[in-house]
Amino acid sequence: MAAALRVAAVGARLSVLASGLRAAVRSLCSQATSVNERIENKRRTALLGGGQRRIDAQHKRGKLTARERISLLLDPGSFVESDMFVEHRCADFGMAADKNKFPGDSVVTGRGRINGRLVYVFSQDFTVFGGSLSGAHAQKICKIMDQAITVGAPVIGLNDSGGARIQEGVESLAGYADIFLRNVTASGVIPQISLIMGPCAGGAVYSPALTDFTFMVKDTSYLFITGPDVVKSVTNEDVTQEELGGAKTHTTMSGVAHRAFENDVDALCNLRDFFNYLPLSSQDPAPVRECHDPSDRLVPELDTIVPLESTKAYNMVDIIHSVVDEREFFEIMPNYAKNIIVGFARMNGRTVGIVGNQPKVASGCLDINSSVKGARFVRFCDAFNIPLITFVDVPGFLPGTAQEYGGIIRHGAKLLYAFAEATVPKVTVITRKAYGGAYDVMSSKHLCGDTNYAWPTAEIAVMGAKGAVEIIFKGHENVEAAQAEYIEKFANPFPAAVRGFVDDIIQPSSTRARICCDLDVLASKKVQRPWRKHANIPL
């Protein structure tokens, strides 16, 4: 009897315990369902950014949203977002209210792929607080930049921001500095690209300025330190946003931006094409594309492209298109310092950097702006192991007080320094004039050019015949005869060739074949330089 009672008591306790367990399980399941619902709600909220009304306003401005831009830039389905649930930490000025909390804050960050190649990206969301930068916003950007440096992958920033978030005060300024530091740390390690797709003002402008390439969208993007209202109050100048910091200003006058595109879609599609020229990092080679353009292809039209009259202009871009693969050339800064041409192309499938003087503009003279433009490009190519092809037709440095007062000596030295410092394969082709110090600067043999060619039309000399005759034959009765004598002796490729300053005098039609062959040989080039902390380029 007693045993039966004990069994009954144990059974009762077990029944109570089981009931409690069932209740606990139901509670846990309910909690899990609640958490999952919250997660999904947060995701839906994050995907909407600042809400449908603000998305509609963004579209009315002719602009895509932050997420639409990422979707168009990256391969379909490749985007892996990070920090979607991050929110700002500001509690002042009513910012702690739920209505002022947006999952992801005002920037979308993550990684994805462009034509199968890894890239990290951040896209500022103008629909959330005007894309303004908070401490959390900066933290998200810094996190993906750190990851990109660690794994060796490029960073692309899609900028559309009203500036620092005033409510956060100095924390926003600290956030900018954190980003700037990473821009500098990543420089020369991974490619960094900025695409300005809206406003970018105040301290925000320095991050794009520190990146390797800055592109803009016409009519909707602006870059300036201080806006029109501040300019008016300080200098009494009346200027519009477009005039002060629009795409035209920065691609034609300041040189801050490298190219401008018609709209968001055009910009993002071109950015995908541009990305294909670049290596993932300084430790990786540039991608090699299958080439259907024969490497030994002759270009007969080049034999007559240089005019017989040395003062007559021609278009160096035509020469570049003729020798590169499939005539494809992605020019950088095409509307700034037009007397020098820089850009990317492929030779037998390999990415190469092209530098060339433009006889159509200022006779191809080097000046302050062209020297800085060329130097910056050469240094990028050298940092990322991209071979350099240089086409030379340069009568010298542009004379005048404006150039001298502006510091042409220092700025011209930048281009010289960049070519001398570069250890990548360097092939130089002198098509016509190579006069004076400008001859030395343009990737000459004396600056460790690997292969230096001259066309039969090349004139390699201290200066042009007219100027030389006025000095050498001053007071000579027959000036024309003296000039002819000088041309015969010096204004041709032979004086340089007999001294080994050019490796060969080639027929222009064979230029592509010779360059492709040289690049094959130079692919294994290695150069050891003395150790130093860093160089001191004449800034």
UniProtKB/Swiss-Prot annotation:
For the biological process aspect of GO, one term held by this record is:
fatty acid metabolic process
**Catalytic activity line of the entry:** propanoyl-CoA + hydrogencarbonate + ATP = (S)-methylmalonyl-CoA + ADP + phosphate + H(+); butanoyl-CoA + hydrogencarbonate + ATP = (2S)-ethylmalonyl-CoA + ADP + phosphate + H(+)
Which InterPro entries does the UniProt record give? AccD/PCCB (IPR051047), AcCoA_carboxyl_beta (IPR034733), ClpP/crotonase-like_dom_sf (IPR029045), COA_CT_C (IPR011763), COA_CT_N (IPR011762)
GO MF entries: ATP binding; propionyl-CoA carboxylase activity
Tell me the residues on which N6-acetyllysine occurs.
99, 474, 489
What happens on changing residue 536 to D? In PA-2; affects heteromeric and homomeric assembly
Give the enzyme's EC designation.
Answer: 6.4.1.3
Outline the extent of the CoA carboxyltransferase N-terminal domain.
32-290
Region described as Carboxyltransferase: spans on this chain: 32-533
Q: Which residue range or ranges hold the CoA carboxyltransferase C-terminal domain?
A: 294-533
Q: Which disease is it linked to?
A: Propionic acidemia type II: Life-threatening disease characterized by episodic vomiting, lethargy and ketosis, neutropenia, periodic thrombocytopenia, hypogammaglobulinemia, developmental retardation, and intolerance to protein.
Domain writeup: The beta subunit contains the carboxyl transferase (CT) domain.
Q: What is this protein called?
A: Propionyl-CoA carboxylase beta chain, mitochondrial
The source organism is Homo sapiens
